[in-house]
């Protein structure tokens, strides 16, 4: 690894940073979103993180909620050094119970009544530093609870700062140390003044300066990229036409000019006319070095007979890197004896924070990982371990989707690219359940084209964050032209989301949904039935595989 990497300061070296330790909650990421909306930089790591390996000191720590019981044998915990850092600690839900349980294992037990949803919470003013968490927020709040276990006995050294009907210790604070616990979820939007509570903790108790803003990101990241890459090395990067890779490519162009080479790989899994449209759009709006590589035969050949989703992602990720390493050698050779001469050392990806979080296991075990993301866990081991010919460069990995869109606008990227629906690197390969074959790719490609076209025609494309058609591995009986058919089931999915960490199904009008279904069944040979996926994220993910 280049020495420049050591001198390029990461954000936590520049900004006061609140560390969020994830205990497994489905809403842990919302804590980060609330902090960043306040201008406080934050990072989330699994609760298994060892403090001695952290390499930096946060100004405060938040322990998230989680689905476990603190008294269970396999309950997740945190490094005891968290409480020896000398910084404020806030426990949320499970994190609150963990703080109490560490002080007294008898203090946490199952409650008599489960407490889910909104409830009224009374704030207790006790005349000590414990009042600072709810300072300026009145005498009561409507808060969101989601728990069965609770603190049933106040641990020694703690005081009660809030109660509800079913939780006598809905808020606790240590008498002398800046350690707080709350049983409710301030990160959920339905909690009254939840963001204010997080602000009190981060800015008043931790003393974090609210100076994280996207305006600073471009200059800082360009400086970091230049230090990291140096004066001679060249960078190649995958582009798909999606907002993530487009913004990353534009940033690299700004940082190192013509030493950045964008590569659009046609892996045989693109949408209808995707390659031509993406090339035309990127050429028109970005002015970058762009090469189109046809890898369709290679990808489809390697995927033949493979049905397991993780295996497909790994194959696709590995094949991408194989092709990029070949392209790197070609670029180096063409640049010989020119002012662009230099080794291709870096591979650019538009990885976002959501990609990293989705690939994380909060317990540190592979079994807890949601799935390998194509921009994270889908890369071959040699790439992740730095053993490949190319080293990984991910300048957007600290940002959420909405932050990337805002950053793209700051860079002057055309709205046509900023507002484009996401399309995954593995393409239609993860929208075909089971084996990927040329026949099945063509079927889902046609269905997807009809779906997206009708969304555009209805004038709702910009209301939908992401939409696509997928193909199930099972088949269903149908009747077409008085004849029995036995065809595939097409799954339609459309969601709305701010940051891609959570999502809700889009509510189509019934007439439009029926019209879409009718066209797909009538116009796409091989499809006998159409269904609409109404699963939220969580518990589902946006992509099916």
Swiss-Prot record:
Residues 17-211 form the Glutamine amidotransferase type-1 domain. It comes from the Eukaryota. Disulfide bonds: none annotated. The active site is at residues 93, 185, 187. It is found in: Cytoplasm, Cytosol. ATP binds at residues 240-246. GO terms for molecular function: ATP binding; GMP synthase (glutamine-hydrolyzing) activity; GMP synthase activity. PROSITE patterns: GATASE_TYPE_1, GMPS_ATP_PPASE. Residues 212-420 form the GMPS ATP-PPase domain. One of its GO terms (biological process) is GMP biosynthetic process. InterPro entries: Class_I_gatase-like, GATASE, GMP_synth_C, GMP_synth_GATase, GMP_synthase, GMPS_ATP_PPase_dom, NAD/GMP_synthase, Rossmann-like_a/b/a_fold. Its EC number is 6.3.5.2. Catalyzes the conversion of xanthine monophosphate (XMP) to GMP in the presence of glutamine and ATP through an adenyl-XMP intermediate. HAMAP family: GMP_synthase. PANTHER family: GMP SYNTHASE [GLUTAMINE-HYDROLYZING], GMP SYNTHASE-RELATED. This is GMP synthase [glutamine-hydrolyzing]. It comes from Gibberella zeae (strain ATCC MYA-4620 / CBS 123657 / FGSC 9075 / NRRL 31084 / PH-1) (Wheat head blight fungus). The lineage of its organism: Eukaryota, Fungi, Dikarya, Ascomycota, Pezizomycotina.
């Amino acid at each position: 690894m280049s020495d420049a990497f050591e001198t390029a300061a990461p954000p936590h070296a520049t900004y006061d940073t609140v560390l969020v330790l994830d205990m497994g909650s489905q809403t842990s990421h919302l804590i980060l979103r609330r902090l960043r909306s306040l201008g406080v930089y934050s990072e989330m790591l699994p609760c298994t993180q060892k403090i001695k390996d952290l390499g930096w000191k946060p100004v405060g720590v938040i322990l998230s909620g989680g689905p476990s019981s603190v008294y269970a044998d396999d309950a997740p915990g945190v490094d005891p050094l968290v409480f020896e850092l000398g910084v404020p600690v806030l426990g949320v839900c499970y994190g609150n119970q963990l703080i109490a349980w560490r002080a007294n294992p008898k203090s946490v037990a199952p409650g008599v009544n489960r407490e889910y949803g909104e409830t009224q919470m009374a704030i207790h003013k006790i005349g000590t530093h414990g009042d600072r968490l709810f300072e300026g927020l009145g005498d009561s709040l409507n808060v969101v609870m989601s728990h069965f276990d609770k603190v049933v006995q106040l641990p020694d050294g703690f005081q009660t700062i809030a109660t509800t009907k079913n939780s006598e210790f809905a808020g606790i604070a240590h008498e002398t140390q800046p350690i707080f616990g709350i049983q409710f979820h301030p990160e959920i939007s339905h909690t009254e003044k939840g963001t204010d509570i997080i602000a009190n903790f981060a800015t008043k108790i931790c003393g974090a300066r609210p100076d994280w803003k996207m305006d600073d990101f471009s200059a800082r990241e360009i400086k970091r990229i230049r230090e990291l890459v140096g004066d001679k090395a060249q960078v190649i990067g995958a582009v798909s036409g999606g907002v993530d890779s487009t913004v990353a490519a534009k940033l690299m162009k700004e940082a190192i000019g013509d030493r950045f080479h964008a590569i659009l790989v046609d892996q045989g899994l693109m949408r209808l006319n995707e390659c031509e449209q993406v090339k035309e759009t990127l050429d028109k709006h970005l002015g970058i070095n762009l090469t189109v590589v046809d890898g369709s035969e290679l990808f489809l050949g390697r995927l033949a007979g493979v049905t397991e989703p993780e295996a497909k992602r790994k194959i696709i990720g590995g094949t991408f890197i194989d092709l990029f390493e070949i392209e790197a050698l070609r670029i180096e050779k063409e640049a010989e004896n020119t002012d662009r001469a230099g080794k291709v050392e870096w591979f650019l990806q538009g990885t976002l924070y959501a990609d990293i979080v989705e690939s994380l296991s909060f317990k540190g075990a592979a079994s807890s990982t949601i799935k390998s993301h194509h921009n994270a866990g889908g890369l071959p081991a040699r790439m992740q371990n730095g053993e490949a010919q190319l080293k990984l460069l991910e300048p957007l990995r600290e940002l959420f989707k909405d932050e990337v869109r805002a950053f793209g606008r700051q860079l002057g990227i055309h709205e046509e690219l900023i507002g484009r629906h996401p399309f995954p690197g593995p393409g239609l390969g993860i929208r075909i359940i089971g084996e990927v074959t040329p026949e099945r790719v063509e079927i889902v490609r046609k269905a997807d084209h009809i779906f997206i076209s009708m969304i555009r025609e209805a004038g709702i494309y910009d209301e939908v964050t992401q939409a696509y058609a997928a193909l199930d591995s099972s088949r269903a009986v149908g009747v077409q032209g008085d004849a029995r058919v036995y065809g595939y089931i097409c799954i339609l999915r459309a969601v709305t989301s701010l940051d891609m960490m959570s999502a809700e199904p889009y509510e189509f009008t019934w007439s439009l949904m029926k019209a879409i279904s009718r066209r797909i069944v009538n116009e796409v040979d091989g499809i006998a039935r159409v269904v609409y996926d109404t699963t939220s994220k969580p518990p589902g993910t946006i992509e099916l595989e």
